[in-house]
């Protein structure tokens, strides 16, 4: 939740908000030895009741790949991974606010405050009539302007006040944070391409079994971690992907306490075993395994400068498409997707999971955060950059006549209160979903 809490008038604040990060990308079917069309962030399948997960596995994981995470729950894990995720989020906030700040300063527009975080001031200093501060909660930031500040000795008709500047100047200032995040996202992806390369995936037939729960039906009947299920009840699982995982889960669900025939590949051996699913509380079958598509991942590096820009461009536009598509799906299916809207606690939890599982994944985590922040802020809603832009464009349509100050402040105040309420709700909801909090309750 990124809010502007500047003491400057509401009409000249530039607040920011993050949402819909729990599921930032769309699911595309895996392709053999292709660039990933989406983020390295794993997306949980719809079969969480059976511990199945559509997850990418990398050679440079920090922890074993069979670490589980339940759908709708978050686990911060190690302090190191939390700090890494928090640092990424803070850096993105700094970039966004710096975009606004530079756009104003380079045009000679007066700026009174530059803050990272909100709440009580931890440290501050003044330079060139600007107060720079670090605040207690580094999950937001703002750039403050002295417009209509009763304590300011600047004349109200000063041409260098933001409110007195031409429409184009104000549009540049308000949109600069969004532009900065988009540029930063591309720079992150470009750095990833140059430094570690892009992930490629190679698909194999069957469904991988990363983990088998102790004392489960699968454990009792001989299924082991690392096994690959090639067929279920005579149906070949020729393609690797979420469809194959769904086939296995569906057969298991339909056959509680009835034999299910699995053809298994274990190392160089191939054989059949019969598993009898246990009956769960809802009457469906379960065998107590974690499942994932049978894919392996490697890295591809560009061979020359043109290929570097080509790789970075394709990855950037692919991630951008996924972010926009996710936002569209959120609005079109809000009743189903509302639970996936996330606040800063969930974002850091997801980032910590990425950092813990795969250090390289932080590149795309950061790029996705930048793109999400840019897109969300562009929405024409009060308290967002897009809302401020909408008011400026309305002024242009009205021939340069501004809305009455009381009306403008009323619109922005209602938007800020809504965002504050939603932010507090998300923080509480996401905090209650943390694993260690659930264990305490």
Swiss-Prot record:
The keyword Transmembrane applies. This is Probable membrane metalloprotease ARASP2, chloroplastic. Belongs to the peptidase M50A family. Its EC number is 3.4.24.-. It is found in: Plastid, Chloroplast inner membrane. GO terms for molecular function: metal ion binding; metalloendopeptidase activity. The chain crosses the membrane at residues 171-191, 373-393, 407-427. Its cofactor is Zn(2+). Metalloprotease essential for chloroplast and plant development. May be involved in regulated intramembrane proteolysis (RIP). GO terms for biological process: proteolysis; response to cold. It comes from Arabidopsis thaliana (Mouse-ear cress). SUPFAM superfamilies: PDZ domain-like.
């Amino acid at each position: 939740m990124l809010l502007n809490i500047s003491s400057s008038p509401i009409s000249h604040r530039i607040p920011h908000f993050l949402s819909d990060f729990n599921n930032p990308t769309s699911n595309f079917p895996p392709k053999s030895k292709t660039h990933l069309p989406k983020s390295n962030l794993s997306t949980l399948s719809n079969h969480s009741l059976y511990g199945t997960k559509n997850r990418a596995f990398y050679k440079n994981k920090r922890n074993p790949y069979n670490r589980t995470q339940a759908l709708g729950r978050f686990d911060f894990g190690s302090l190191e991974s939390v700090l890494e995720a928090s640092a990424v989020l803070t850096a993105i906030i700094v970039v966004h606010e710096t975009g606004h700040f530079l756009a104003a300063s380079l045009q000679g527009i007066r700026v009174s405050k530059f803050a990272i975080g909100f709440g009580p001031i931890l440290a501050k200093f003044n330079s060139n009539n600007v107060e720079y501060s670090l605040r207690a909660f580094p999950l937001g930031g703002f750039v403050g302007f002295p417009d209509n500040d009763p304590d300011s000795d600047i004349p109200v008709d000063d041409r260098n006040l933001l409110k007195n500047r031409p429409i184009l100047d104000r549009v540049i200032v308000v949109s600069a944070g969004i532009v900065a995040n988009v540029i930063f996202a591309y720079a992150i992806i470009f750095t990833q391409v140059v430094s570690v390369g892009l992930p490629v995936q190679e698909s194999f037939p069957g469904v991988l079994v990363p983990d088998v729960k102790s004392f489960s039906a699968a454990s009792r009947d001989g299924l082991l971690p690392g096994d690959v299920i090639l067929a279920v009840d005579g149906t070949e699982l020729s393609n690797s992907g979420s469809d194959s995982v769904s086939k296995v889960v569906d057969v298991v669900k339909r056959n509680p306490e009835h034999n299910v025939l699995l053809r298994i590949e274990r190392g160089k051996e191939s054989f059949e075993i019969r598993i009898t699913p246990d009956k769960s509380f809802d009457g469906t079958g379960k065998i107590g395994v974690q499942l994932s598509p049978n894919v392996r991942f490697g890295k591809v590096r560009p061979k020359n400068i043109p290929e570097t820009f080509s790789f970075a461009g394709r990855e950037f536009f692919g991630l951008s498409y996924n972010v926009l598509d996710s936002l569209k799906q959120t609005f079109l299916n809000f009743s189903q997707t509302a639970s996936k809207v996330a606040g800063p606690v969930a974002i850091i939890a997801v980032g910590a999971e990425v950092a813990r599982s795969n250090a390289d994944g932080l590149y795309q985590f950061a790029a996705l955060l930048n793109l999400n922040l840019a897109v969300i802020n562009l929405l024409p809603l009060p308290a967002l950059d897009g809302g401020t832009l909408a008011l400026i464009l309305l002024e242009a349509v009205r021939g340069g006549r501004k809305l009455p100050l009381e009306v403008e402040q009323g619109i922005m105040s209602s938007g800020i209160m809504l965002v504050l309420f939603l932010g507090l709700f998300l923080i509480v909801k996401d905090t209650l979903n943390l694993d260690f909090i659930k264990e305490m309750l």
